[in-house]
Amino acid sequence: MTRINSCPAARVRSDSRLVRCDRREFLRFGLLPVAGLPWLPVGLAPAAETPAALVPLNRFPRMVQEFFVQQVRLAEQRSLAAKGSLKTKVDAEAYVRGVREKIRACFGPEPERTPLNPRITGVIERDAYRIEKVIFESRPGFPVTANLYLPKTDKLPVPGVIGTCGHSTNGKAEKAYQSFAQGLARLGYACLIYDPIGQGERLQYVTENLKSRIGPGVAEHLHAGNQQFLVGEFLGMWRAWDGIRALDYLLTRPEVDKHRVGVTGNSGGGTMTTWLSGVEQRWTMAAPSCFVTTFRRNLENELPADTEQCPPRALALGLDHDDFLAALAPKPIIVLGKERDYFDARGVEEAYARLQRLYRLLEAPDKVGLFIGPTEHGFTQENREAMYRWFNQAAGLPPVTGEPPLVIEKDETLQCTPKGQVAATGAKTVFQFTREKSQQLTARRGTVGGDALRRAVVEVLKLPARHGVPDYRILRYLARRRFPLPHAVAYAVETEPGIQALVYRLFPGPWYARPPRGASRAVLYVAHLSSDAELREEPLIGEIVQAEPASAVFACDVRGIGESQPDTCGVNSFHAAYGSDFFYAIHSLMLDRPYLGQKTFDVLRVLDWLADLGHREIHLVARGWGALAGTFAALLCEPVKQVTLKHALTSYAAVAESEDYAWPLAILLPNVLARFDLPDCYRELQAKRLRQIEPWGPMAGKEA
């Protein structure tokens, strides 16, 4: 991926000045506020604590990472077993058909093919080629800005290529991307390269001076893409659809040979080349650069990827990066990587080996290739030349000896719009489409309640069946933590293999052993971020302890917060939009187990454990993030007789219909608004004496 904006280490200071970072800096510093806003305070080290300060406990910071590694390894093993079972050409052909069906399941149905309404807003004449400034609509009112590089030749029609961009701020005008488009034109190709959503001339969240107020590229993708999940949309499909419609336009041009069309791109463009190979069969050749590896390598290396780079259900369906290219088999494909890339070259070689075996079975071993350049991430000259050689061979053109001399244009020269942004022309944004769909789903859904609501909750959260009573560990006695009661014991309740919910039991006197039986009523507090910290700092807990002196009092950290808050993906990255909490939330969607569903399952298993201890009546109290898991668990668990929620989200529709929101992906549920919304749950919980305290709207308490 190319640099978006400068963020060198030399600029990092201990004051509060703010900088913008590209994906490389995202990975180095692991920072972006969870609200999706682009500005980062550089001085992020916590202030020195007074001797009396207590640091929140976190004794299991690797638990979530190792759990996901295990889950993804199992998915990979199943996928490799399926690939290993292929023995004949017929087997391989059936496999290719199967992956195409699975990819369609991931990406969802294609939208309607509406008129492109193309227009050419300018032409740039150069020595051996010309550049046409093209705008077309991939969806009604949703313009795509593109440059069409056309060779000056009498040998028509020429092969065509769709060029996809990585996460460059200036999109199609980025030097490396101009270079491959111009290089192809000088070699006799027509190349249409277009701006991705949130980049170049297609910023989605603009200020009055037409700059991104969230941050171009990664930040805009995350902010729009996470929100889209609520209405059953996937940003990867939106970006792929732009590419499909770009191909539709390219094939209307008489200069282009419809039987010789390729697709290439680097980094985020390598992603789109890979996805487009999976969802579109008209390509005759493809060359993804600096993206293809394996999902397992990315996870084990703690490498976050954008929303659009993580297809929903992909891992659950047995798909890996190579499968999206296998969908195009046996057409010519070359996988381009880099030895010094953060996309692991070992995974590049593994993906290629899987494709190589498939192509051998398809009797086309020479139609798949591999090139790993010696340098770092980027569509540098060596990778571009490998792409040229491959495409010339596939298109029946003479061998390439090297890249022709290039002349790089200024960004402004390549702009298609008068002011350099489609926003200035009144274009619709991704958010506006999301808001409209949310409103449509709400009107269509109506009110949901009773057993229908409970079934919908189980199905949307993908909650597995619960069996038996969970085992637990008794951890070291907690002394002097300043809880509402003077003593506490922590129990690690095993909610599923590899996962423990950390549960504190408060006591008036010393206790070191298993929980006592006796009290029929218990209070269970489900924490927002840390039970340890909130038992000291949240006044609601103290109030309830005083109000219910006869009740046993427990507090719970579900997976991924408090005692198991991950320390992965960079220092202090947990709350970053590209950090560890997002990392596991997006992998959860690929595994088809929403992260909030897993957290809800933890609460349900803790409730099973409490029931086994003799607590037949539960007052469930929850705050913030924990209020969502608490809501669903209370809805599904009969022993919960009373519910108190503080800072619970008002509704998912409010998030879907607000351009600015601060709730993380871990709290958002895929396609939830097609089935129910939180007010349905709150209405149902009135029968359990629901008390709501200071509900939070889309900005999670950060409203101005």
Predicted feature locations:
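N-terminal secretory signal peptides and thylakoid transit peptides that target proteins
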Residues: 7, 11-34
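Alpha/beta-hydrolase-fold serine-hydrolase catalytic core, especially in secreted/extracellular enzymes
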Residues: 48-144, 329, 336-502, 506-521, ...
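Alpha-helical scaffolding within the catalytic cores
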Residues: 312-325, 356, 675-680
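C-terminal segment of classical bacterial N-terminal signal peptides
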Residues: 37-44
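Loop/turn elements at helix/coil->beta-strand transitions in domains of secreted/extracellular proteins
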Residues: 158-159, 187-189, 258-260, 281-284, ...
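Generic beta-strand/beta-sheet core signal
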Residues: 149-151, 164, 194, 264-266, ...
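Cap/lid segment of the alpha/beta-hydrolase catalytic domain
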Residues: 156, 160-244, 251, 294-302, ...
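Primarily recognizes the serine-hydrolase "nucleophile elbow" in alpha/beta-hydrolase
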Residues: 248-314, 606-674
